[in-house]
Amino acid sequence: MTSSPLLRFGIIADPQYADAEPWALLDRYYRNSIAKLEEAFGVLNGEDLSFVVTLGDLIDKDWQSFDPVLAAYKGLRHESFLMPGNHDFSVAPERLGEVHARLGMPAAWHDFSRGGIRFVIIDGNEMSVFSAPEGTPRHAAARARLDALLAEGAINAKEWNGGIGDEQFAWLEATLARAKAAGEKVVVMGHYPLYPENEHNLWGGERLLDLFERSGNVIAYLNGHNHVGNLGRHGSTWYVNFKGMVDTEKQNTFAVVELYPDRIEIIGYGREDSRTLPL
């Protein structure tokens, strides 16, 4: 096994901050996430990392929740990539179109290269009943898709999941093809899990599984959303679901990911599992 990684980066999933009372039934402690983020940044700032990515659900609800959580991120010395989850759209309807900009994203879906690896951020909220106001064509299309999934008896036919549209899928397909032509390995990141089958999975996620298998260069898909975490392998792709930071009163969870030519090493902190994933 090679001893030096191609690059290292940090992972945080589902801080889901809000100035709200805990939800004891689900073991979620919304206010405590600021202190957990600060603790995580204290550790991550001491590491040599290319960047830190947060896999969605920075907030639980309310536009004003973004202020304290984004202020906490100013304490992170590394480059930060944020993406929305379903809860980040639990804001007033007139604010829905501002969420990506509030998170400082260049676009709802985008890609970048670090250390010879292509990183791709997808937006599984695009087709959802919460990301566009009622009465809009995008909301109506999402409602129709959810109704079709309910009629099929799909286990992920939930209002708190979402999917991607044809334009985004075509962009993803083209991005993977360009990376393959350039000889780049790819890591795709999104909020919603794709595999193994689970009630939290992206609507129509099977299309992405097939695409990744055809492409053959997607070494990993990283996500949050399912707070208990999960792990699977399909084709040559590892599917890693990181645990939710908002869960439990005091225990934290975050990770450092190391990419090697022959493996992925995940160094888990707190409740997050450490893993060695051979490529």
Q: Where do the language-model regions lie?
A:
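Short, high-confidence coil segments that cap the C-terminus of an alpha-helix
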Residues: 49, 183-184
